[in-house]
């Protein structure tokens, strides 16, 4: 019996990958993941067997890794950012069920909120909330409730999955919810393609964020009341 290692590879660059993640990928027999994430590591580990699945096929991806482990292989399931924060770790455990085999190891990684904050300056310097705007698995009513309470609590908010082709207006809807409790002058930031080709970031207000163009490769921050501009924005 082999094992499944669920590996958080960080935002994209090798420099942002942990030593533990690198060692896990060096030691495995096969690397499984969403095609975009597999492409980020394929060049550095050319001797591995690679298995890719498209977007929305997370269960198939995890089942494949478990099948490889049952066949005696060490399968690394790669996840962007951290393996447990919107990653595949929970689903791998769920699909394995109550059995203790195959063995599962979870390797953490640098999540997008932290790497985006490093680009933008120091927007996460105090308490903060991380909220995904994807309603594929979470009802929008639940997301709206979380946004409302985070705004009322005056937390800095990191927004994951702000938009995609199937939900292009979700960030605008989120901003409308936040604007019920926050001023349109509230400092915000957008980081895109963190650690990858075309990396970029910009600072803007909440009012401007409502009209901004974003995609699934963006991470958004909305600051709390007392964060000063020179703390938030990289020079």
What do the predicted segments below correspond to?
Residues 170-208, 213:
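Accessory alpha-helical/coil subdomains and C-terminal extensions
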Residues 85-153:
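Class I SAM-dependent methyltransferase SAM-binding "motif I" and its flanking Rossmann-like core
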Residues 3-7, 73-77, 128, 153-159, ...:
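Generic beta-sheet signal
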Residues 143-186:
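Conserved anion/nucleotide-ligand pocket segment
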Residues 1-104, 115:
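Class I S-adenosyl-L-methionine
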Residues 225-232:
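Conserved small/polar residues in nucleotide/adenosyl-binding loops
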Residues 214-224:
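C-terminal edge-of-domain segments
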